[in-house]
Amino acid sequence: MTQSKAVQWLSWLMVGLALFAAGVGLFWQRDTGSFDFTTLRGATMTTYGQGLYRYDSLFKGAGARGTDAVTLGLALPLLVVALLLYRRGSARGALLLTGTLAFLLYVYASLALSLAYNELFLVYVALFSASLFAFVLAFAGLQPLAAAFGERLPRRAIAIFMLAAGLLTLYVWLEPIIGGLVAGQAPRWLEGYATMVTEVLDLGIIIPSAVLAGVMLLRRDPRGYLVAFPLLVILALLLPTIAVQTYLQLAAGVTFTTPEIVGPISGFLVFGLIAVCVIWILLRDL
């Protein structure tokens, strides 16, 4: 398969920028002091008060550091390995590269659009842009691989898993949103922010893509594997992301109920491990 020079240059640019951005976010922890302020909805929000995310809430600031940790420890090493394989013309490398780019696009779209303004705003914009165009070009280059997937793959099981993951995520986000609408109040984790960017990305892009992949596979369209693979990588990397985020949020003083901790982590544990197994099955088939 043909290797895109643009994908390679954009990906190496992302390695450098993400290494810098995630390193600053995780390790620069100058304490400027947290403070309370009244939100647009009349509630009181406490700021994180440390480092790059000092103007974000405790929940979001600590969570962003968790994202930085997983980016440094898992996503960037995976991106480098996938890039090296991609340069050699490896089909598996191309799939892994596209999946890792999808995860980083998801991460930096969230950070660029949802964080309180900070010194790395332009870096986040650059990472969002680079990951978007690199992903589009890499995904377009995957199309010849659709015919390479064999008939012996557990097509129906993978399709059902994609549909289940999409529907479960739909329930997870709609439950607090609809509950808030019924109660006449904003969802709890909106806090002092104007809107919920992660929910926009999940409800508007991730969930429809998962359902589309499942339907395509049920209809025996092998392109469904190409749609599913980036989502599987995102799902696999979200497991350590949610776990590290929760740990740092608890350490920062965020309070959760037991179901709020056990539910997401156990759910992502099950779905994340299944996603890893499906990734392995698809890569082995090439």
Where are these regions (language model features)?
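Non-cytosolic membrane-interface motifs at loop->transmembrane helix junctions
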Residues: 116-128, 189, 254-264
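A loop-to-helix transmembrane entry motif
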Residues: 60-68, 186-209
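Membrane-interface transmembrane-helix boundary segments in multi-pass integral membrane proteins
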Residues: 195, 199, 240, 244, ...
